[in-house]
Every structure is written in structure tokens, then in C-alpha cells.
């Protein structure tokens, strides 16, 4: 499913950035003013933040360079759009058997 691929690409970049630090989810989440479990869900691809502010601050904490920040923003836009599409998709038609 394309939408899940876009969400996973966003999550993979978050995990890559987190992996460059020696900080726990709790240590990274604290200055972002979000719960550690929320940050973990973002990194696992289980959720996508509706706003970019926390993602931008996360990137800064992880030492992302300008090109990585642009790529993270691009992937976030695609992930948000994919989640919106998956939520508004019509239910599958029932079988006519």
C-alpha cells in the first residue's frame, strides 16, 4: 500500500536521525514537550504528527544538516497526505455473491 510506504519512509528517516544520538526516546521527547511513547510511535510508523514543529525540533536535537531537514519535511508532507488518504478512502465494496 503506497500510503504505508510513505509513512514508513518518514519513520525510517526519524529512526536514522535518532540512531545518530545516544539519547533515549524519553531524553529526546522531553525538550519536544511530547511523551516518549508518542515519539516512539512516530519512529515506528504507527503515527504521523499533524504539525511539523516537533519534527523540526527533533531533527535539530539529532544534528540533522539542512539537506536532511528538507528531506525530512518532504517525507513528512507525503506521510501526512498518505494518512489522510487512507482515512478518507471509501470502504471496499461488498461482494455480490
Model-derived features: where do they sit?
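Flexible coil/turn residues that form the inter-helical turn or adjacent wing/linker of helix-turn-helix
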Residues: 21
